[in-house]
Amino acid sequence: MKNYINNYDRATAHIACVGMGWFPKTPGGLDRYVYELTHSLAASGDRLSLYGLDLPEAEPNPGVELINLATADSPLWQRLWLTQRNFLNKQPVKVDAINLNFALYSLPLLPVLPNKVPITFTFHGPWALESEKEGESKLGVFLKQSLVEKSVYRRCDRFIVLSQAFANILHLEYQVPSSKIHIIPGGVDLKRFQPNLSRQQARLQLNWPQDRFIIFTPRRLVKRMGLDKLLQAIAEIKSRIPDIWLAIAGKGPLQLALEQQANELGLNDRVKFLGFLPDCQLPIAYQAADLSIMPSQSLEGFGLTLVESLACGTPALCTPVGGMPEILTGFSPDLITSSCEATAIAQRLEELIMGQIPLPSRAACQDYAATNFDWHKIAFQVRQVLLT
């Protein structure tokens, strides 16, 4: 296997990357992606200028320069004005490529982006459509899509998406030509996410029960994540699988409603709401579980949780939504439920737990993740698109 860690067999490039927040302070999928990409490229010899909000003053990696654009809690107009001003004032004299990652903070940069530098937008999701799913007004959705997203996308030379599902959305909803779209999956840091603990050791560290079948899901507690469906599914099978135990990590506006639902379903001794789980404990939680799950109901562009879980040696179950099936189809199609409904989730959980469908081994999970989603390999593919 080719070693991508030390060098990509090419001249060093200077790449400017405009993100959003700072991982792990804001542990969302976009921020994690930008962090891992920039640090993987820097580890291979490139020079990275990373722009974002609330970035720290110091970065131990000498190949990554951090440029703070604004503070996230400032008024929107001020954030956008400062984003443009600070990007313009601290723009490198010479840069080989620019990678944008979030439309809102890319919008004020449009007048000041250099003309002869390739601009690539990494499409992490349809911001307007996600807002609509969370109850945004029709006017708000229209403004986000027409005045922000489409304006930014018209300026970009090419696009990276993490799945065919999001390539379709980018083409159909935003009229981006298919010829400009490159599909490159997300990656996982195999040094952090690896099976280095026994299940018993991991459970002991987290103070989780040793004698239960544990399902783990790290999710934002919002509607489209499908946690209400998952709770219904657990309630359906609890009488037949009394030792089932669900651990939910994450925060969000639905926390009280979900806790109330769990109580009404009689799941207090079978569901644990962990709240915010520090990033350092995430690999431990995956290893402590018998199974991870993503019960998403809509707009799941990739499914990083699935890959992280597999890298830790733990099988992962998903609903047939967005890009998630693209991860698991080539590995174990039985880890995809037949629908998003609670009954389908319950049926597949019961089949897996009762052994009617065998769960992949720890070694098979880790090997599949390492072969297909190693960040160093993914970063190499991204770099090729950025510099084309």
Region spans (language model):
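Short hydrophobic beta-strand element within catalytic cores of glycosyltransferases
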Residues: 315-318
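Carbohydrate-associated surface elements
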Residues: 165, 187
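Conserved donor-binding/catalytic core segment of Leloir-type glycosyltransferases
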Residues: 16, 209-225, 231-234
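Membrane-proximal helix-turn-helix segments that form the acceptor-binding/catalytic region
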Residues: 140-159
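Short His-centered aromatic/hydrophobic patch
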Residues: 100-105, 123
